[in-house]
Curated annotation (Swiss-Prot):
This is Glutamine synthetase. Coiled coil: none annotated. Its EC number is 6.3.1.2. It comes from Yarrowia lipolytica (strain CLIB 122 / E 150). Residues 101-364 form the GS catalytic domain. GO terms for molecular function: ATP binding; glutamine synthetase activity.
């Protein structure tokens, strides 16, 4: 309420552009720049820079990292003509920063544009209060066992719905293709879905939706966790189930293309697991609606498999499949990139496994 009267003040033609980027630890950073007019395209936005030594993206003696605008979204917090700018990180020698995985992913998406690959990602997350207690949980104790919370309704069954609703509206305002929300199996855990999105826009929109979630949660004094197993014990983990289809899969007779894709995924199980999120071994145990991290499996309507084919898809003979292995803390550029590489084919100047290793190397 205190801030609202200032947000209503005229800006006299100025436009505020909040540049956001991904740091060395898959955290989101941002800073704001004043523009003298509203940009009509990415090309109208200036390149900017930041201190990469403060985000573990560059050494102190050569710390400038450049922000190259990649996508523009309306700003639901400042509103008006103000915008949020998703930016890629580049080094001063003209090479992509080693934590800039968007660049490699975009190469693959462009090379396989004719496949018209669609993704839909189910982002799960857990909410904690300022004392790091799960929202709604008894202080120093535990709620009743899992059962009544999934898609629950009513006090004691769902928690922090106001945060979820605010985030939903913020995404819609910003043009994020958010397709739904639901309370999850563990209390204080929620899910939202983004998609279907084509190509590189999937990862762009998921990162933007995460930024919006953190910003909304700030206003409620709530911390957002994307850890795949935030609480030990008989509680579900958190994933980023990734739904995938190509044009040929979505057409009548597409099941043969889905089955061919699953065979390719089986052959690269270890490579995919390597990019499917840190601490994913704590989640992929074969329990709590997951498959085992050490083996690949697939099945119709089976949520204990690596790859699930929805019952409706099996019945109709075409559609999409769901990869249930990705953890909630994935970098979607790595996941959608390696998925495209595996099912559509590799290209000479991009390798998502090597791209992952590049980000894990010591030094700059």
């Amino acid at each position: 309420m205190v801030l609202s009267k200032y947000l209503d003040l005229p800006q006299h033609g100025a436009v505020l552009a909040e540049y956001i980027w991904i740091d060395a630890h898959f955290n989101i950073r941002s800073k704001c720049k004043t523009l003298d007019k509203k940009p009509t395209s990415i090309e109208d936005l200036p390149e900017w820079n930041f201190d990469g030594s403060s985000t573990d993206q560059a050494p102190g003696h050569d710390s400038d990292i450049y922000l190259r605008p990649a996508a523009i979204y309306p700003d639901p917090f400042r509103r008006g003509d103000n915008i949020i700018v998703l930016a890629e990180c580049w080094n001063n020698d003209g090479t992509p920063n080693k934590f800039n995985h968007r660049h490699e992913c975009a190469k693959l998406m462009s090379a396989h544009e004719k496949e018209v690959i669609w993704f839909g990602i189910e982002q799960e997350y857990t909410m904690f209060d300022e004392s790091d207690n799960p929202v709604g949980w008894p202080k120093g104790g535990f709620p009743a066992p899992q059962g009544p919370y999934y898609c629950g309704v009513g006090t004691g069954k769902v928690f922090a719905r106001d945060v979820v609703e605010a985030h939903y509206r913020a995404c819609l305002y910003s043009g994020i293709n958010i397709s739904g929300i639901n309370a999850e199996v563990m209390p204080s855990q929620w899910e939202y879905q983004v998609g279907p999105c084509e190509g590189i826009s999937m990862a762009d929109e998921l990162w933007m939706s995460r930024y919006l979630l953190h910003r909304v949660a700030e206003e409620f004094g709530i911390k957002i966790s994307f850890h795949p197993k935030p609480l030990q014990g008989d509680w579900n983990g958190a994933g980023c189930h990734t739904n995938v289809s190509t044009k040929s899969m979505r057409e009548p007779g597409g099941m043969k293309h889905i089955e061919a894709a699953i065979e390719k995924l089986a052959a690269r199980h270890k490579e995919h697991i390597a990019v499917y999120g840190e601490d994913n071994d704590m989640r992929l145990t074969g329990r709590h609606e997951t498959g085992s991290i050490g083996s690949f499996s697939s099945g119709v309507a089976n949520r204990g498999c690596s790859i699930r084919i929805p019952r409706s898809v099996a019945k109709e003979g075409y559609g999409y499949f769901e990869d249930r292995r990705p953890a909630s803390n994935i970098d979607p550029y790595l996941v959608t990139g390696i998925m495209t590489e595996t099912i559509c084919g590799s290209i000479p100047d991009a390798d998502m496994v090597e791209e992952t290793k590049r980000g894990e190397e010591e030094g700059f």
